[in-house]
Every structure is written in C-alpha cells, then in structure tokens.
C-alpha cells in the first residue's frame, strides 16, 4: 500500500475512532495488549533480525533503544493496559458558562483526528503511540526508522490482530512501511489527511519536521538535561541522582548530559563522582576548573551543546545558582533540569530562573516520563511553549484542565496569558 492509499484509509476510519465509547476503547486496548503477548515470539524474532542488521551500523548504545526482550514486550503490553485504566479524556467537560444573551458555552475535549508519528529506532513507541491514539479517539499513522522496520511491522500486525479479533477495523493503527525520506516528507505535507504530526527522535529528525511540515506539528525536543549540585547539597544524594540520571539508560532523552557543580563543593564532590561513574566507564569531559580537581577529557565548546546519548558526561564548575541558571539558559534544549540542594531558597531561585519543560528539586531527570507521573505512556516531551509543553498526550486540550494540573508540580505549562507552575519533587530521588 502506498503512503497516499494508507492516508486515505486512515482518514476514512476517523469517524469510527471518534465514536468509540470508553468501554469499547478499553476493550480494544486490552485485546491489543493480549495480542502483543500472543505474538511475542514473532515480534522478538523480527527484532532479532533488526538488531543483527544494525550491529556495526549504529552506535552500540543505540542498540539498546532498538532491542526488545520478553520483559520489554511484557512492559509494552502493561503500558497498553495502563492506558486502558486511565480516565477517558474525550468528551470531558472543562467549563460551562451561561451568557446573558442565553448562550450556554461549553469547553470539551475532542479527538484530533489522524495523528502521524515519525520516530526512529524504538519499537516500543509503536505500541505506546497506538495505545494513546486509540484511547483519545484518534487514528494513528506510524512511520518508524529503517533500523526497526521488521520489529514495527510485527508489532503492528499483532495490534491489528487484537483489533480485528474484537470486530474493529485494523486501519485504526497504520504503519508506513516505506522508510525513505520521501514517505516522511509526504506525511509532513499531507494537509487534509494528517491533523497533527509528532516527530519523536533525534535533533535532525525534529528540525526537519519543524522546518518542513505543512500540517500542525508538536516539537518534541532533544534532551540536553542538566543537574546542578548546589553548595548546600547532600553530596551522597547528589551522587545517587547523577549516577541514576546518567547511567540507568543513557540513550534516552531524559538522561543527564551535563553536571554543574558549585565551586564550594567541587573538591569534595568531583572525586567521589568520578569514582562512582568509573564502574560504568563514563567518560567525563571537564571544564578547566573541574580538570584541576580530577583527571578526564578536556571539554570542548561543543560538549556543552551535545546530546551524547552515551556514557559521556560534561562537567562544569560554577560560582552560584545564578551562574548555573545562566549556563542552562545558554545551552539547554528546554527539556529537563534538576538542582540538588537542602536550601529552599536556592531551590526556589533555580526553579524561578530555569525555563525548561520540567524542573526538579532533589530528583533525577529520568522522572520526566508519563508512567512516572502516573499518566501512562506519553507521546513525547514537548519543549515548545505555544500550546503544548512537557508530557504530550494526543487529545485536543482546549483549556487548562485536571490532566494538566496533575503534573504541573514538576512540569512548566504555559497558559494564555503565559504563566507557569513549578514545585518540588523532594520525596523521590531516583528513577530505576
């Protein structure tokens, strides 16, 4: 099937997707989750072929993104069931106002329509995107990377089997099997067929979509995430947080790429950090002040503007909270930043000065995740400010409602007129 034919089929099933009841959507999600487990052998065999073909072609750390295991397939199924358990956003009444002229004005949530997702080598995104689109009454068109085409094909075949077992059209979930740039460009330009485009991947992919798309596009930014260790930090807590944020899964966008350390604790903290990260063979790229304390690779100017997605951490010594915030303003992609401190005033100053989608106090940047926020899997992390910022879920949110307020404690959400809410996540320090 050509991309044009696929888009026609997706558009044709839009009314059916929007008309599904909550019970019907949840039943389909449960069936799709079970189908993933029933077809796990096929999915894992296809994935093994993808991984074998990718070895020597993509970086070893990126193989982790591509790889599936029985546990990861089980996690994909659990994610779909978690989405089924979420409240149905469609039809939610956000506000109601009676006007003096007799009009009753209501704000409600409605589906977007056809959502196209362009992503790279993460087969789990296929299941996550399908689940979120179905729950929100949308049709999805998925276009993954060439490295994962076999895996994605097997996953979509399983999901469609689950849909069709329940009598629903398989075209609720669609996969573009053409992984050429032409197919991606087709989606970017498909006005009248694609109601929303979400790119999820590296800097080049996202920039291409933002620059070229003729359809509405949500920018899901790359993650140059910072952790600032303050003069008033609990240094053991700081070690745990930096270790988790850098090493638990370095190939994901919420992993830390830069550690900023206050000059007053640099001599005590940096040797301990180097020793802790040595076990994971993390390469430290050091500013001159950090290099005067511990050995490592001298940092070049580009190292503080790079999303490494690898066992590499750029380290800089700073003079104050304000100095840290200024560095972040100059180099951050606006994804997730954290401060480790026991000083409430320093934490408040950091949160007020840092302009990113998620800001943490005494917590790992790895918490920027829909599951960790209790909201199920997310479509992506938006770093843009107009209309959509932070964790993104495919429903047309026409006003700030409970779904936004639920995670406003950690995520900056611009409203209109623009205001932001921030807060503390001081209880949980690490994400496993």
Regions found by a protein language model. Give the residues of each.
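N-terminal Rossmann-like NAD(P)+-binding subdomain of aldehyde/semialdehyde dehydrogenases
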Residues: 1-107
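A structural signal for short, well-ordered beta-strand elements
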Residues: 18-19, 231, 317, 340
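Flexible, glycine/charged-enriched surface loops at secondary-structure junctions
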Residues: 22-27, 90, 166-173, 248-255, ...
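Rossmann-like NAD(P) dinucleotide-binding subdomain of oxidoreductase/dehydrogenase enzymes
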Residues: 85, 93-236
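ALDH superfamily catalytic-core signature
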Residues: 121-124, 128-136, 158, 165, ...
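Conserved C-terminal structural/oligomerization subdomain of aldehyde/semialdehyde dehydrogenase
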Residues: 300-432
């Amino acid at each position: 099937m050509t991309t044009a034919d696929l888009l026609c089929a997706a558009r044709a099933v839009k009314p059916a997707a929007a008309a599904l009841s909550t019970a019907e959507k949840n039943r389909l999600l449960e069936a799709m989750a079970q189908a993933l487990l029933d077809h796990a052998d096929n999915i894992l065999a296809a994935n093994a072929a993808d991984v074998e073909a990718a070895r020597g072609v993509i970086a070893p750390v990126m193989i982790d993104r591509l790889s599936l295991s029985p546990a990861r397939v089980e996690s994909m199924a659990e994610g779909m069931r978690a989405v089924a358990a979420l409240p149905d956003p469609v039809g939610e009444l956000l506000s109601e106002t009676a006007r003096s002229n007799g009009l009753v004005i209501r704000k409600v949530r409605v589906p977007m329509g056809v959502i196209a997702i362009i992503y790279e080598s993460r087969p789990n995104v296929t299941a996550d995107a399908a689940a979120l689109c179905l729950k929100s009454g949308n049709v999805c068109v998925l276009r993954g990377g060439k490295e994962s085409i076999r895996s994605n094909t097997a996953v979509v075949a399983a999901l469609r089997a689950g849909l069709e077992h329940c009598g629903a059209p398989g075209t609720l979930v669609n996969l573009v099997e053409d992984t050429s740039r032409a197919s991606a460009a087709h989606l970017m330009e498909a006005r009248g067929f694609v109601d929303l485009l979400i790119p999820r991947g590296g800097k080049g992919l996202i920039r291409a979509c933002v620059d070229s798309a003729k359809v509405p596009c949500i920018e899901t930014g790359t993650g140059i995430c910072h952790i600032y260790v303050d003069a008033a930090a609990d240094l053991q807590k700081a070690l745990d947080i930096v270790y988790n944020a850098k090493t638990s899964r370095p190939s994901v966008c919420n992993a830390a790429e830069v550690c900023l350390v206050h000059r007053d604790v640099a001599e005590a903290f940096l040797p301990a950090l180097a020793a802790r990260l040595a076990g994971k063979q993390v390469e430290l790229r050091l500013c001159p002040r950090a290099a005067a304390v511990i050995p490592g690779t001298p940092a070049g100017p580009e190292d503080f503007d790079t999303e490494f997605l690898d066992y590499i951490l750029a380290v800089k010594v700073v003079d104050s909270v304000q100095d840290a915030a200024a560095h972040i303003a100059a180099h951050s992609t606006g994804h997730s930043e954290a401060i480790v401190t026991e000083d409430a005033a320093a934490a408040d100053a950091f949160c007020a000065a840092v302009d990113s989608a998620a800001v943490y106090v005494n917590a790992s940047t790895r918490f920027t995740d829909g599951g960790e926020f209790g909201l199920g899997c997310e479509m992506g992390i938006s770093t843009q400010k107009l209309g959509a910022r932070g964790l993104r879920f495919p429903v047309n949110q026409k006003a700030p409602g409970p779904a936004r307020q639920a995670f406003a404690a950690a995520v900056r959400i611009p409203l209109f007129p623009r205001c932001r809410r921030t807060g503390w996540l001081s209880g949980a320090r690490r994400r496993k």
